[in-house]
């Protein structure tokens, strides 16, 4: 049974989320502020965190940043419609996804299921390692190496890079990446792809001065992994 930490300071949202999560056979933990969320996350090591941005003590952005420095636990951010900059920042610092309030509980449950599946199985369709020039990905071990240096990737980042590697040299549209990596009909914009690519390039940069030459932006279309890099 997966354990999910729900972090929100609104009792009505806490009650609705815990009811629906437990109805779907998840174990739930609750925190009403950012400080308490960090304490519980460190002690209980949950499988997923649903994290509101607007929190007392520490806001969700700060909590997400701290958690991402300490672990790769999947994080779904809850945001208000007028918090676009916070949504982008949350994705850039490592949140796996976001849901805008007021949200459909059915939509959120679908995302929870998908994010957990990705985290637990890495969402890859082959256990065979892939090598594209100086990049090697081993899905069975969840290991990635670039220029013979190990990369520390979250499940989402690994899936994204693996998907691009399986289609090396081919342009993947943002919609195709959403479908194959995120794994559901996405209700928001395609910005999650762009911010995930940005994070991925940041980690590739640790092994290369020019990560953008490996994951290439095809303006107006999407991205591709350069098979000649």
Which residues make up each language-model segment?
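Short hydrophobic/Thr-rich beta-strand motif most characteristic of the beta2 strand and flanking loop
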Residues: 6, 25-32, 36, 40
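Short, Lys/Arg-enriched segments at the junction into DNA-binding effector domains
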Residues: 2-3, 114-171, 175, 209, ...
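His-Asp phosphorelay/catalytic-motif detector in bacterial-type signaling
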Residues: 45-47, 70-75, 187
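Active-site residues of response regulator receiver
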Residues: 8, 52, 79
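Hydrophobic residue at a beta-alpha junction
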Residues: 31-32, 40, 55-58, 85
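Basic, amphipathic DNA-recognition helix from helix-turn-helix-like DNA-binding domains
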Residues: 59-61, 65-69, 74-131, 202
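Charged docking surfaces used in two-component/phosphorelay signaling
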Residues: 12-23
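Active-site beta3 strand of CheY-like receiver
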Residues: 44-50, 55
């Amino acid at each position: 049974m997966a354990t999910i930490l729900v972090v929100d300071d609104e009792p009505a949202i806490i009650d609705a989320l815990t009811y629906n999560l437990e109805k779907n056979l998840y174990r739930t933990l609750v925190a009403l502020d950012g400080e308490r969320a960090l304490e519980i996350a460190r002690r209980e090591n949950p499988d997923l965190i649903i994290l509101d941005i607007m929190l007392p003590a520490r806001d969700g952005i700060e909590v997400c940043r701290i958690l991402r420095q300490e672990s790769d636990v999947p994080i779904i951010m809850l945001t208000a419609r007028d918090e676009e900059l916070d949504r982008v920042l949350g994705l850039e610092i490592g949140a796996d996804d976001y849901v805008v309030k007021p949200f459909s509980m059915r939509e959120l449950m679908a995302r929870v299921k998908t994010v957990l599946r990705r985290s637990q199985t890495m969402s890859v369709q082959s256990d065979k390692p892939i090598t594209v020039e100086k990049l090697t990905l081993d899905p069975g071990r969840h290991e990635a190496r670039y220029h013979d240096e190990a990369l520390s990737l979250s499940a989402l980042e690994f899936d994204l890079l693996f998907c691009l590697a399986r289609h090396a040299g081919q342009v993947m549209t943002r919609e195709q990446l959403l479908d194959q990596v995120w794994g559901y009909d996405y209700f928001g914009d395609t910005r999650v792809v762009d911010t995930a690519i940005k994070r991925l390039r940041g980690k590739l940069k640790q092994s290369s001065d020019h990560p953008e030459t490996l994951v290439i932006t095809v303006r107006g279309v999407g991205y591709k992994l350069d098979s000649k890099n």
